[in-house]
């Protein structure tokens, strides 16, 4: 089966926020604007697991929701990632700061074990990305639901499946 070439923007538009917390869509403010308003050094970009990261990310999400012209502010958070520690912490900080209900789906492929998922509160931990379909079915959203997708290498090389060649290429 052959698929045509596509870009991430075909799936999610320009509402992409880069690692430095700067959105692709220039209508959205990012870290540099946030830091300037607070008198913080622009070079001190918070890490994903820090509360300040969640604060900036939530501000960007609120701006994006406003640009979409939806009725009402965001009210639910769904998060997709591949690491229990970093993505799980980022989600929990975002959920705590926003007060929104939500769930995170965190998958790390392990093809040697039978497919399974476990729940730890609002975290779904899975060893197969295929289990994502169950997560989506159990957590329907609406126009006030934001879905945060940690794209790092997850979209190109799922942890435990195709991540080694990407790690090797980064090291070269």
Question: Language-model features: where?
Answer:
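HAD-like aspartate-dependent phosphatase fold
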Residues: 1-172
């Amino acid at each position: 089966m052959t698929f045509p070439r596509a870009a991430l923007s075909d799936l999610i538009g320009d509402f992409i926020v880069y690692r430095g917390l700067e959105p692709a869509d220039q209508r959205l403010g990012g870290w540099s604007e946030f830091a300037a308003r607070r008198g913080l050094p622009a070079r001190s970009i918070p890490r994903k697991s820090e509360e300040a990261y969640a604060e900036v990310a939530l501000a960007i999400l609120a701006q994006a929701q406003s640009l979409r012209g939806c009725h009402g502010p965001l009210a639910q958070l769904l998060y997709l990632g591949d690491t229990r520690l970093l993505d799980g912490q980022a989600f929990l900080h975002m959920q705590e700061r926003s007060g929104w209900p939500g769930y995170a789906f965190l998958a790390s492929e392990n093809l040697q074990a039978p497919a399974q998922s476990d729940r730890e509160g609002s975290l779904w931990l899975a060893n197969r990305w295929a289990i994502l379909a169950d997560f989506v079915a159990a957590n329907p959203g609406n126009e006030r639901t934001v879905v945060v997708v940690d794209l790092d290498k997850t979209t190109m090389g799922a942890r435990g499946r195709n991540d080694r060649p990407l790690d090797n290429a980064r090291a070269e």
